[in-house]
């Protein structure tokens, strides 16, 4: 009995020491760029980019496998901030950064069965509702990552452009050149 | 040292001036001789819940409720909000959404009332004797009546009347400049209701506890100046009638303060920092009605003008009257108007749908024909500087415009985009017809959108972190539970073993005893 315990402990300690030594010896330094990228990313681990969480994307981006525009919930601001620290080799020249309209999830209440699957999946707790009760989306908290759409068994959730309100509406950019051209052709 | 202008020789008070500004054709002759007439009862009344700056009011009526004139139907939500009252008696036929009286035409929460035609008053607000009332009581009465700034800014007036707690106020300026072309509703109100306005001014001066009161009127309204000079005292205050030059944008709060006191309000500061509060003429009138008669704000004076209107007029209309009914009352259009505006031609809102209602801040309805609207043909900017001369806040619009069109909004903000009043002097002055102020409106909206998205991103980050922490806590709790249960199981087993062990020996001893006993 004592011999067995002693041999197992000795084995454990020895292997543990070996593992520890190996970790020290073959330690791989995480490039600081990964951490910097991860800091800029929203950090919600929503998976909209197709990589395993924000850290996954940060690593892929540092290696040059993902464009700076990969984070859709982050939108233009995140892309611009990333383009500043991720240099050209990481794909900053992946075309002009498009202005992405912010999207939000919308629940069709007729189809919602109150299964709570979306509710559990939402990375920002933007979906509210109880079991067997119609769920709804808090628009200001929704990042449009579409995670809930994938899990909904009744396809009751769709992604929509975030509706404008009087507070968020603003005038379109005037196009003086176009006006001049049309006026001239009319004349 | 400041050199006095020649104008001071004629008007000793006029020793200050404002920067920039323009002198557009006023077109006020269209309606300046039209007496204020009362508009007949409209078929429908639509009251948006947001007719003021701040939080939306909260509806307290349901569909099919019967309401009386002056009844509270939506309650102010929070300190920066305003009550909304039923303008006439009738039935609430919907509490839903309707097109906003706004350039966007977006749907906004609206209460729709079908008037029963009896116009039956419900209980009035309790009357107040301002001579004996405390300033707080006056402000509370003004808040209860749902009065907001009626010059167009729609800032809740009661909040402004309560400023004495925070600022050392010395001066009240009553804004009767009405610098926007076409509009004459304030002019007519001063000419016809000077006594009531004077009383309202006195009440406001008392609530604010100021030392001096000025009434600023542009020099192109001689009859209004005369009327207000006749009624220049109330509640122990004597107002100084200050004739200001006819110049757009004289009616801007900060410019009026500069013109009268010579002090410039710092960027993004309030005039209250200088000890000055500015209220509109129409607001003074509404305050008079609210305090003396307990009447909430349910009607206002509106100028209906422009060459597209067959019979331009000044009307007293119920808040919530559809614009289309008002235009029909004024004889309809002479020709299909090029633009339909709410407010003045310089800063008003173009609307697409004429069924939108008049709200508390609507001072004009203008139907402008193609001849009255600016030419659309634009030419390149040659940096002539006319926009710089015209800008009343001293910006360089051509530079702002160039930066915005190059996509450098932050750079535009750095050179003062956020101080732009959107008065439109630059676009008016531009010989190349460039849409300068329109670009600034766009850029301001874009910047505030970016700001709010940034804010939202930070908030969602916080939410995600909170969720993660919660999930970890749950996992930890589960783990602890498992360990506890394991420990419990082990303890139970041990106890059982111990019990078994304890149970075993007695028979042995018993046999031993037996064995001992047998021999």
Swiss-Prot record, chain A:
How is this protein named in the record?
Ion-translocating oxidoreductase complex subunit B
Domain annotation 4Fe-4S: ranges: 29-88
List, alphabetically, the PANTHER family matched: ION-TRANSLOCATING OXIDOREDUCTASE COMPLEX SUBUNIT B (PTHR43560:SF1)
Report the gene name. rnfB
Which Enzyme Commission number(s) are on file for it? 7.-.-.-
Q: Where's the 4Fe-4S ferredoxin-type domain?
A: 103-132, 133-162
| Any Pfam family hit | FeS
The Gene Ontology biological process annotation of the record reads: electron transport chain; nitrogen fixation
Q: Tell me which residues bind [4Fe-4S] cluster 3.
A: 122, 142, 145, 148
Q: What induces it?
A: Expression is reduced under iron-limiting conditions.
The record's section on InterPro entries has: 4Fe-4S_dom (IPR007202), 4Fe4S_Fe-S-bd (IPR017896), 4Fe4S_Fe_S_CS (IPR017900), 4Fe4S_Ferredoxin_RnfB (IPR050395), Elect_transpt_cplx_RnfB/RsxB (IPR010207), RnfB/RsxB_Proteobac (IPR016463)
The alphabetical list of record keywords is: 4Fe-4S, Electron transport, Iron, Iron-sulfur, Membrane, Metal-binding, Nitrogen fixation, Repeat, Translocase, Transport
Top-level EC class as recorded in UniProt = translocase
Q: Which residues bind [4Fe-4S] cluster 1?
A: 46, 49, 54, 71
What membrane topology is annotated for this entry?
Answer: Peripheral membrane protein
- Subunit structure, briefly? The complex is composed of six subunits: RnfA, RnfB, RnfC, RnfD, RnfE and RnfG.
The Swiss-Prot or TrEMBL record describes its family as follows: Belongs to the 4Fe4S bacterial-type ferredoxin family. RnfB subfamily.
Instruction: List the GO terms this entry assigns under cellular component, sorted alphabetically.
Output: plasma membrane; plasma membrane-derived chromatophore membrane
For region Hydrophobic, the annotated ranges are: 1-23
Q: Which cofactor does it need?
A: [4Fe-4S] cluster
Functional note: Part of a membrane-bound complex that couples electron transfer with translocation of ions across the membrane. Required for nitrogen fixation. Involved in electron transfer to nitrogenase.
Top-level lineage group: Bacteria
Q: What is the lineage of its organism?
A: Bacteria, Pseudomonadati, Pseudomonadota, Alphaproteobacteria, Rhodobacterales
Residues at which [4Fe-4S] cluster 2 binds: 112, 115, 118, 152
From Swiss-Prot, chain B:
**Residue positions binding [4Fe-4S] cluster 2:** 391, 420, 423, 426
Keyword 4Fe-4S in record: yes
Keyword Kinase present in the record's keywords: the answer is: no
Question: What protein name does the entry list?
Answer: Ion-translocating oxidoreductase complex subunit C
* Origin superkingdom: Bacteria
Q: Which InterPro entries match?
A: 4Fe4S_Fe-S-bd, 4Fe4S_Fe_S_CS, Ion_transpt_RnfC/RsxC, Nuo51_FMN-bd, Nuo51_FMN-bd_sf, RnfC_N, Soluble_ligand-bd
What PANTHER family does this protein map onto? ION-TRANSLOCATING OXIDOREDUCTASE COMPLEX SUBUNIT C (PTHR43034:SF2)
Keywords per UniProt? 4Fe-4S, Electron transport, Iron, Iron-sulfur, Membrane, Metal-binding, Nitrogen fixation, Repeat, Translocase, Transport
**GO:BP terms for this protein?**
electron transport chain; nitrogen fixation
Swiss-Prot/TrEMBL cofactor(s): [4Fe-4S] cluster
Q: Which family does it belong to?
A: Belongs to the 4Fe4S bacterial-type ferredoxin family. RnfC subfamily.
Localisation: Cellular chromatophore membrane
Gene3D superfamilies, per database record: 3.10.20.600, 3.30.70.20, NADH-ubiquinone oxidoreductase 51kDa subunit (3.40.50.11540)
Check the record and name the SUPFAM superfamilies matching this protein. Answer: alpha-helical ferredoxin, Nqo1 FMN-binding domain-like
Q: For the region Disordered, what residue ranges are annotated?
A: 494-519
């Amino acid at each position: 009995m004592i011999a067995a315990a002693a041999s197992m402990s000795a084995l454990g300690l020895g292997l543990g020491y070996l593992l520890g030594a190996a970790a020290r010896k073959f330690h791989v330094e995480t490039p600081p760029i990964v951490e910097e990228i991860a800091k800029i990313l929203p950090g919600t681990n929503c998976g909209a980019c197709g990589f395993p969480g924000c850290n996954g994307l940060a690593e892929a981006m540092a290696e040059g496998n993902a464009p700076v525009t990969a984070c859709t919930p982050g939108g233009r601001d995140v892309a611009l901030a990333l383009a500043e620290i991720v240099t050209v080799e990481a794909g900053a020249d992946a075309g002009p950064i498009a202005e992405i309209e912010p999207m939000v999830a919308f629940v069709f209440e007729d189809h919602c069965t109150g299964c709570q699957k979306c509710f559990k999946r939402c990375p920002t707790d933007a979906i509210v509702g109880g079991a067997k009760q119609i769920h709804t989306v808090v628009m200001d908290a929704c990042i449009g990552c579409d995670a809930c759409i994938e899990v909904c068994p009744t396809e009751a959730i769709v992604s929509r452009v975030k509706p404008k309100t009087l507070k968020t509406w603003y005038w379109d950019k005037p196009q003086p050149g176009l006006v001049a051209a049309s006026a001239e052709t009319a004349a | 040292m400041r050199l006095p202008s020649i104008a001071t020789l004629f008007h000793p008070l006029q020793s200050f001036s404002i920067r920039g500004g323009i002198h557009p054709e006023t077109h006020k002759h269209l309606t300046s001789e039209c007496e204020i007439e009362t508009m007949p009862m409209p078929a429908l009344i639509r009251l948006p819940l947001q007719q003021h700056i701040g939080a939306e009011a909260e509806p307290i009526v349901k569909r099919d409720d019967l309401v009386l004139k002056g009844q509270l139907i939506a309650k102010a939500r929070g300190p920066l909000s305003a009550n909304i009252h039923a303008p006439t008696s009738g039935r609430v036929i919907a509490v839903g959404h309707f097109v906003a009286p706004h350039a966007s035409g977006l749907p906004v929460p609206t209460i729709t009332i079908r008037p029963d035609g009896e116009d039956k008053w419900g209980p009035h607000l309790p009357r107040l004797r301002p001579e004996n009332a405390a300033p707080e009581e006056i402000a509370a009465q003004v808040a209860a009546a749902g009065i907001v700034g009626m010059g167009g800014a729609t800032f809740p007036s009661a909040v402004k009347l309560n400023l004495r707690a925070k600022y050392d106020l010395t001066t009240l300026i009553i804004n009767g400049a009405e610098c926007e072309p076409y509009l004459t509703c304030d002019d007519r109100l001063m000419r016809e209701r000077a006594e009531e306005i004077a009383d309202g001014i006195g009440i406001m001066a008392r609530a604010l506890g100021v030392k001096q009161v000025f009434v600023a009127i542009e020099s192109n309204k001689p009859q209004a100046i005369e009327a207000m000079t006749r009624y220049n005292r109330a509640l122990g205050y004597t107002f100084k009638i200050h004739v200001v030059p006819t110049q757009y944008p004289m009616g801007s709060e900060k410019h009026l303060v500069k013109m009268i006191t010579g002090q410039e309000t710092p960027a993004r500061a309030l005039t209250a920092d200088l000890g000055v509060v500015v209220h509109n003429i129409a607001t003074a009138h509404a305050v008079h009605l609210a305090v003396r008669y307990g009447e909430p704000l349910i009607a206002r004076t509106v100028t209906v003008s422009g060459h597209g209107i067959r019979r331009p007029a000044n009307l007293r209309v119920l808040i919530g009257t559809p614009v289309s009914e008002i235009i029909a009352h004024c004889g309809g259009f002479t020709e299909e108007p090029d633009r339909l505006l709410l407010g003045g031609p310089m800063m008003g809102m173009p609307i697409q749908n004429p069924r939108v209602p008049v709200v508390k801040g609507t001072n004009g309805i203008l139907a402008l024909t193609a001849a009255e609207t600016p030419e659309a043909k634009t030419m390149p900017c040659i940096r002539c500087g006319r926009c710089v001369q015209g800008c009343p806040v001293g910006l360089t619009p051509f530079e702002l415009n160039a930066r915005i069109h190059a996509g450098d909004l932050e750079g535009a903000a750095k050179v003062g985009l956020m101080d732009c009043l959107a008065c439109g002097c630059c676009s008016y002055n531009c010989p190349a017809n460039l849409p300068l102020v329109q670009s600034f409106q766009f850029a301001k909206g874009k910047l505030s959108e970016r700001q709010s998205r940034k804010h939202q991103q930070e908030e969602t980050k916080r939410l995600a972190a909170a969720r993660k922490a919660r999930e970890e806590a749950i996992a930890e709790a589960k783990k602890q539970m498992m360990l506890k249960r394991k420990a419990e199981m082990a303890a139970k087993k041990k106890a059982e073993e111990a019990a078994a062990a304890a149970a075993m020996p007695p028979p042995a001893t018993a046999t031993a005893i037996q064995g001992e006993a047998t021999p």
